[in-house]
């Protein structure tokens, strides 16, 4: 399965050692010629493809974890990225302040470079699609219809989520309708008698 070329051993252990040695001697490979994310971190072009979004400068943990992540991944090729992240977080917490200091200094240097390159930069996190949908849903349910009458069920603006099925009437929680009660109601009839029952505590 393994072959010898020019008398060199190409076993997995030797290959892994060669990769690590290559990475140490060619560290610019990992930074200047890396991905767009790496180019941003080293002061290169920080704009994402097709967007005018500037990435944040790296913090001390990210500076430290970049090289550590590569080492852990090479030592444990079967390890999932989420497991590597957990391990790196634990290892970072175990470092002393003196061991972390060079990474804080490098992060400070990168922050200063970023500030010089983008003087008007302000961090604006992108909202995920799910969050945007939830916000739109809250806005929809928090608006009062102009034809709503006193005593009608009026959705209120909410912070977070309510238990499914509970609603409010005049600011008071009311008992959710059962399937049988719901069938008895028609769109033309009011539900004031059902809705005026206080919610169980």
From Swiss-Prot:
Pfam families from the UniProt entry: HMG_box
Domain of life: Eukaryota
Any single GO CC term annotated in Swiss-Prot or TrEMBL for this entry: cytoplasm
GO molecular function: calmodulin binding; DNA-binding transcription activator activity, RNA polymerase II-specific; RNA polymerase II cis-regulatory region sequence-specific DNA binding
One example of a Gene Ontology biological process annotation: cell differentiation
Residue spans of biased composition, Polar residues class: 186-195
Keywords: Activator, Calmodulin-binding, Cytoplasm, Differentiation, DNA-binding, Nucleus, Sexual differentiation, Transcription, Transcription regulation
Compartment(s) where it occurs, according to its Swiss-Prot or TrEMBL record: Nucleus speckle; Cytoplasm; Nucleus
Keyword Transcription belongs to the record: yes
Main location: nucleus
InterPro entries: HMG_box_dom, HMG_box_dom_sf, SRY, SRY-related_HMG-box_TF-like
Annotated family: Belongs to the SRY family.
Purpose: Transcriptional regulator that controls a genetic switch in male development. It is necessary and sufficient for initiating male sex determination by directing the development of supporting cell precursors (pre-Sertoli cells) as Sertoli rather than granulosa cells. Involved in different aspects of gene regulation including promoter activation or repression. Binds to the DNA consensus sequence 5'-[AT]AACAA[AT]-3'. SRY HMG box recognizes DNA by partial intercalation in the minor groove and promotes DNA bending. Also involved in pre-mRNA splicing.
Protein's recorded name: Sex-determining region Y protein
Source taxonomy: Eukaryota, Metazoa, Chordata, Craniata, Vertebrata
Gene, per the UniProt record: SRY
